[in-house]
Amino acid sequence: MNRIACTVHGRVQGVGFRYWTKRKAAALGLRGWVKNAPDGTVMLEAAGEAGLWMSLPGRCTAGLPSAP
């Protein structure tokens, strides 16, 4: 099992980003956590098979489908 940790910058608080990220990670079979940081970013850590978690950063970069 491998692990990834990252910090996401931009408009990520108050827009449902944590909930969306948690759902995407669960759909990939990943386990972990997502939380708001005091500086306005969102921090996340996910663990699972390498082939699964490698797609998570790209999905986070793409963002919510409803994002402008």
Curated annotation (Swiss-Prot):
Domain of life: Bacteria
Protein keywords: Hydrolase
Catalysis: reaction(s): an acyl phosphate + H2O = a carboxylate + phosphate + H(+)
The keyword Signal is annotated on this UniProt entry: no
Signal sequence coordinates: none
Record-listed E.C. numbers: 3.6.1.7
GO MF terms held by the record: acylphosphatase activity
SUPFAM superfamilies in the record: Acylphosphatase/BLUF domain-like
Residues in Acylphosphatase-like domain copies: 3-68
InterPro entries with a match to the protein in the record: Acylphosphatase (IPR020456), Acylphosphatase-like_dom (IPR001792), Acylphosphatase-like_dom_sf (IPR036046), Acylphosphatase_CS (IPR017968)
Residue numbers annotated as active site: R18, N36
Similarity remark: Belongs to the acylphosphatase family.
Record protein name field: Acylphosphatase
Organism for this UniProt entry: Oleidesulfovibrio alaskensis (strain ATCC BAA-1058 / DSM 17464 / G20)
